[in-house]
Amino acid sequence: MTTPDYQKALGRKIAVERRRRGLSQPELARMVDRSVAWVSQVERGVRKVDRMSVLEALAAALDVPLAELAAEAPVVAAVTGEPPGAGGLRLVLSGAYALRAMLDGRRAPALSTLRTKTRKAWELTHAGRYTELSELLRGLVPDLETAARAVPEDQRAEVFELMAATYQACSAALAKLGEPDAAWIAADRAMAAADRAGNPLLVAAGAFRLVFVFINARRYDQAEETTRTAAEALQPMVNQGTPQAMSLWGGLTLQRAVIAAHLNDPDTAYGQLEQASQVAGRLGEGHNEYNTEFGPANVRLYEIAVAVELGDAGRALRAAAAVDTSGLSAERRARMLVDVARAHSQRRQVREAVAALLQAEANTPEQVRSHSLVRQLTSDLLTMQDPPGAELRDLSKRLTAKPD
């Protein structure tokens, strides 16, 4: 039996068992933590299920032996090897740099140098250059720990602000690289440093980073609790028109839209997008407060992501056609292009999907090649195009190649 035949057989089996249990597609989607569009595509044989963990979740929800579903679907092994930069970033979090700083009595590096390196850390994060980021942080984090203990008291708050921003960059990169545990540690350290700096907005920025960890780990209840409470705390400053608070509140509200989309709640998702759009309109373009990149263009990017998650490919592609990404980072542009590829995939437009993925890869090669969603999407595209084109085959090879 060919792979497409397996997909169709599995889809029919799932549909039969779902109806046998008296479940609707939305009910099954909630039980397996997926979108209604995903369930529909699986049942129609459009989307491939090739991960044992997903089959296990479906079997449990449908109350059937796993063997009955596994017999219908060939499960492929996950890509081995570690994304570039991931190991180095984990080592940054593992070093006993605070202890060394307490004991060795070194002089503090110049604050100007620490400021420059912290800005560079975020430049590398926005560019998706994670190997270079890990190399930079291996020196920057120990220097910040030393400075926190060696600078005069009146400079200490700024050092902790730089430390918070550095750990936020580390968390953002690790979340993109599929390292939720390490990303959580980095986000927690960022919030602790922001607290020691006495900077509530920087604490909110740390919460914003933590939410990405929760979303990637599918801990939507924790993600919603963090976004809701942080946004509520910022509301008075938003009402006063404080740009930094507006950016953070807007970023958190966009995250709430994504969470609602994952939970298949379109009314809430689009409602949150509308609220964020209103604040973005007041704020205007050209802001990157706390590296949120919040503004009208970023709201449109999230509209694309939400629409794709809800299975509304048409809305996603219309939004993509209208967005101006010239002012956004390479990382954000690549993320949007992956969502555009997903929308084309939902319409079985393989050539357009591959073109979007290649553009995304050109923007941030490390991020795209290490992204599990991109690998799954490419696998799906391979089953749609028979035989697959040269560009798609070459992309698949790059995604499954073991990192150097």
Label the predicted regions.
Residues 24, 35-38, 51, 65:
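Short coil turns linking two alpha-helices in DNA-binding domains
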Residues 33-49, 74:
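Recognition helix of helix-turn-helix/homeodomain-like DNA-binding domains
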Residues 71-100, 104:
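Short, charged recognition helix plus adjacent turn
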Residues 1-21:
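A short, Lys/Arg-rich alpha-helix, primarily the initiator
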Residues 63-78, 299:
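Short C-terminal boundary/hinge segments that cap the last helix of small helical domains
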Residues 14, 25-29, 39-43, 69:
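Conserved hydrophobic/aromatic packing and binding residues within compact polymer-binding modules
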Residues 33, 53-68:
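DNA major-groove recognition helix of helix-turn-helix/homeodomain DNA-binding modules
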Residues 6, 106-404:
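Conserved binding/catalytic microenvironments
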